[in-house]
Amino acid sequence: LRAAKQIRKKLGQPATAAFVFAGGEFLAGLEEFCEILRVDGHIRDVAGCVAAGQIRDGEEFGGAEGFSLLAMTGGVSEPVGGDAAKVVPAGADGAVWIQSGIDPDFDARLADWDRRFPGVPLAGGVTGRARDGGPCVFLNGQRVEVVTIAAAGGLELVPSAAQGCRPIGEPLTVTRADSNILYSLGGQPAYRVLERAFESLSDAEKSHAKGNLFAGLAGNEYAEEFGSGDFLIKNIIGADPDSGAVVIGGLPRVGQTLQYQIRSRESALADLGRAFKPAAKAKKRAVAALLFSCVGRGENFFGVESPDASQLRSALGRKPVAGFFSAAEIAPVGGTTALHGYTAVAAVFAVKGGAVGSAK
């Protein structure tokens, strides 16, 4: 109730919509919680999810109780909830997608988004499932599988993604693959290429490489050079030295460029500065942002408090930010919308006019 009154006072007028990311203790009383925000906060629509932790402005609260809230008085469409993302309004300049759980058709739906809405950036996050097996995403107190909110009315969405990886070895063309099994790169066994990439690492990097090696699929095949941020990062699930095969958590295509990657604290810190440059460039036009940060990041990985949130604050200044710790993240890479892991995705709302506010 206090937060609802605070947001109403700060905005000075009714809010079009509010993004709300709450701790698990709110799930049982979700309908009442949203009703209080809507009635006492003068908020038309309340959309968000229950998650493992919240992000409030420049701070991250992993596993904490409470909630973060970002309310907007205009520039966004009416939220759409249901079992799948629906059509966005004509003229939309981006959208936020929040989903509960990952299903086998997730990548196909993202590809369908790119076909139906070319040039409309999509950013978002995935939360888990509730103990009762139901979704943790909600819209106006009702639990739904997906909620989508589009930027419209002169407001645009500027996405950024920090993956925390750097390429190792060399980029090579996939020459043989079957489903998620990678057999050869540049005519060489995929495992042998992985071995060479590993041998190129320093002793310090080799010592912590276990569990931190990934496969990077090029997001843009027409790039002349590849660097951090140019790849869709996929897990390496297994490898067979005898057959030379490497199994990854993605579907490589013959002819696609692939380069192995390493994830480390140092590479992740360096990547943060690069990744949020689009946000920094939009600073003068930005009014607010959402941040979706993987549960595998945060203080436990970086060794510093609120690494993603503080970096975004450095890029945007004291613009209001809300977000949550996610199980997976959604953002475009090289013009292709993709599902990511171990990533921090920022969705910056940049608008010619409008008003926003945030409450803790």
Regions inferred by a protein language model and the residue ranges of each:
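Small-residue-enriched flexible segments
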Residues: 1-40, 44, 49-302, 306-319, ...
